[in-house]
Amino acid sequence: YCTRSWTIHSVPRLTKAKRLMEKLKELLNRECDRTMSSEEWDALFKLSTQIVLKKGDVLISPGDIEPDVYIVKEGIIRGVDFNGDQERTFCFGLPGTVFNSRFSFYRKLPSYYQIEACCRSVVLRIPREDYIAMTDECHSFAVWALHYAWYEQFLEEDRESTVHNGNAKERYIHMLKTRPAIANGVSQRIL
């Protein structure tokens, strides 16, 4: 028989949605050499709307002016450019990847690239004006965005020096070694 009165403190449990958002913040903080606090990421996410894409859905089409910024929350996104009827995958985006049409974002020009879902994917869409306003109003976000842009430049050169060199077998082996989630989650035709 127990006479002691016990107080039970409940430990708050994160819902699946909150766990997913915490994981997304962690991934974004690994995207470059600067990080932001959970609250700062929440401020950015509040500016976004969520878009659910099915495999093959096109988010940005060549010729469209689409200046907004996107963050991959779930799934795999790919960037495609065209030489006539021939398409070439030039990049993939996994959760935590930030992307946009650089032509549209910076100069309000039609997009050169096509951005599409490789599988069921969820992206967060942040209007360009809100993204720019946040860089004006939040120093830590502005620093993060600048370092992310520099990281994107690094990745572009890295892609040219590795992924776009060699024969198909060598490129596939490189993909298996460096980005197995893409090799396992995308059809072989796209790779």
Residues of each region from the PLM?
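Cyclic nucleotide-binding regulatory module and flanking cytosolic helices
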Residues: 16-49, 104
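Short, structured interface segments that constitute the first stable element of a domain
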Residues: 20-29, 40, 107-137
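Cyclic nucleotide-binding regulatory domains
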Residues: 32, 57-119
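Generic detection of short hydrophobic beta-strand segments and adjacent strand-loop junctions
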Residues: 51-53
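Polybasic "coupling" helices that flank or enter modular domains
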Residues: 116-191
